[in-house]
């Protein structure tokens, strides 16, 4: 049976993967209200397509932090991809390069920055948590720089891990044959005592709860790489990110895995975009499963989107070929949405191309009986 959309990959992944692994990737925090809402909120935004526009040629290319990519759809950091497929992050990196887009590598990857770099050329970002031992952070950043990574995506919504009840029930641990490769060959100081199977829980325990804006400033003193602040969902924090020299913002609720009952990212996006005032680009992750979702995010002011779970599920289903297919499907759907909305380039996508549930009656056509 031919796979025709991204959602079908999740069903295949659920069949193929051990329950503990599938649940780790698929679940969210506590009641999982935000997990469902990340998806559902997109359905409360409708299109206002413009017609009789020559859409023979559609240009989806864009420039992110100075790097030209083929489309505004990029790969979000997801941990431990070798649980999904033996090739893990290698496969994802190759698929991203083939699609001409950006891959973000998780610090908690089962392949190291050097291994991912060895797959060949590509524009790659490195996701970073800040640990209690700043020396560990500095070593990770150095390695990412040396491996040719182009930006740091600093995760700021995780002073502690969210309560993911599926993982508690399943007693989630990283399978014994896998390890968090970015922590190999790093002087972990006190962290050395942990064996591999305990390393993932130990590393999680080393995330610094005292992380604050001053650490964003500190990070800029140890690296010249641009820093994207990942996990902003309010105007207040968007303004602070701009003030503290962030190169960009990723509107993210960590795939609904941290604090439940935060808004869907697509609901928080416009507030953040307005607060950033065009001074730095704003990106979105969370719940993007269709090309229509990508268009809606761009219409609300996003410079691009990142996809996470679709990558992991397609990787589990079909390895590198699966990830390539997901990127191609999203690209094709997005191109079709642009054509049917009368937009020939990303700069033509505007707020007037959508009507959201929260818009006032003045901005929405009132149906006459």
UniProtKB/Swiss-Prot annotation:
A GO-annotated cellular component: peroxisome
Subcellular location(s) per record: Peroxisome
Organism superkingdom: Eukaryota
Any Pfam family matching the protein: FMN_dh
Annotated effect of mutating residue 24 to F: 10-fold decrease in affinity for glycolate
Enzymatic class: oxidoreductase
Signal peptide range: none
Result for mutant: residue 108 to S: 100-fold decrease in affinity for glycolate and 500-fold decrease in activity
Keywords assigned: Acetylation, Flavoprotein, FMN, Glycolate pathway, Oxidoreductase, Peroxisome, Photorespiration
Annotated catalytic residues: 254 (proton acceptor)
Site (Involved in determining the substrate specificity of glycolate oxidase): 108
Motif Microbody targeting signal location, chain numbering: 367-369
List of residues that carry N-acetylmethionine: 1
GO biological process: oxidative photosynthetic carbon pathway; response to other organism
Catalysed reaction, written as an equation: glycolate + O2 = glyoxylate + H2O2; a (2S)-2-hydroxycarboxylate + O2 = a 2-oxocarboxylate + H2O2
Names of the cofactor(s): FMN
Record note on cofactor: Binds 1 FMN per subunit.
Positions of glyoxylate binding: 24, 129, 164, 254, 257
Family: Belongs to the FMN-dependent alpha-hydroxy acid dehydrogenase family.
Free-text function comment from the UniProt entry: Catalyzes the oxidation of glycolate to glyoxylate, with a reduction of O2 to H2O2. Is a key enzyme in photorespiration in green plants. To a lesser extent, is also able to use L-lactate and 2-hydroxbyutanoate as substrate in vitro, but shows almost no activity with L-mandelate.
PANTHER family: 2-HYDROXYACID OXIDASE 1, S -2-HYDROXY-ACID OXIDASE-RELATED
Protein's name according to its UniProt entry: Glycolate oxidase
């Amino acid at each position: 049976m031919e796979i025709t959309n991204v959602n079908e990959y999740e069903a295949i992944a659920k069949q193929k993967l051990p329950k503990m692994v599938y649940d780790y990737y698929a679940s969210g925090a506590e009641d999982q209200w935000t997990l469902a809402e990340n998806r559902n909120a997109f359905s409360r935004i409708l299109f206002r397509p413009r017609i009789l526009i020559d859409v023979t040629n559609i240009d989806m290319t864009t420039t992110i932090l100075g790097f030209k990519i083929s489309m505004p759809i990029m790969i979000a950091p997801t941990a431990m991809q070798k649980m999904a497929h033996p090739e893990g992050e290698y496969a994802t990196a190759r698929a991203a390069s083939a699609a001409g887009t950006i891959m973000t590598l998780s610090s908690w990857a089962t392949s190291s920055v050097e291994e991912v770099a060895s797959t060949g050329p590509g524009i790659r970002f490195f996701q970073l948590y800040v640990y209690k031992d700043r020396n560990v952070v500095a070593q990770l950043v150095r390695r990412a720089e040396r491996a040719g990574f182009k930006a740091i995506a600093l995760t700021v919504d995780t002073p502690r891990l969210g309560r993911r009840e599926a993982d508690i029930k399943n007693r989630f641990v990283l399978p014994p044959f896998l390890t968090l490769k970015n922590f190999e060959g790093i002087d972990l100081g006190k962290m050395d005592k942990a064996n591999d199977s305990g390393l993932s829980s130990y590393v999680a325990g080393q995330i610094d709860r005292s992380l604050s804006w001053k650490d964003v400033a500190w990070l800029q003193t140890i690296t010249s790489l641009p820093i994207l602040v990942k996990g902003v969902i309010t105007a207040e924090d968007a303004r602070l990110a701009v003030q503290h020299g962030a190169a960009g913002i990723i509107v993210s609720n960590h795939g609904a895995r941290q604090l439940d009952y935060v808004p869907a990212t697509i609901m928080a996006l416009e507030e953040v975009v307005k607060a950033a005032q065009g001074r730095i680009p704003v990106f979105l992750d969370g719940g993007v499963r269709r090309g229509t979702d990508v268009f809606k995010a761009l219409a609300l002011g996003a410079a691009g989107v990142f996809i996470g779970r679709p990558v992991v599920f397609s990787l589990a289903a079909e390895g590198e070929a699966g990830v390539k297919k997901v990127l191609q499907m999203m690209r094709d759907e997005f191109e079709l949405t642009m054509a049917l909305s009368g937009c020939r380039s990303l700069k033509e996508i505007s707020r007037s191309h959508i009507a959201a549930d929260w818009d006032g009656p003045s901005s929405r056509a009132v149906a006459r009986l």
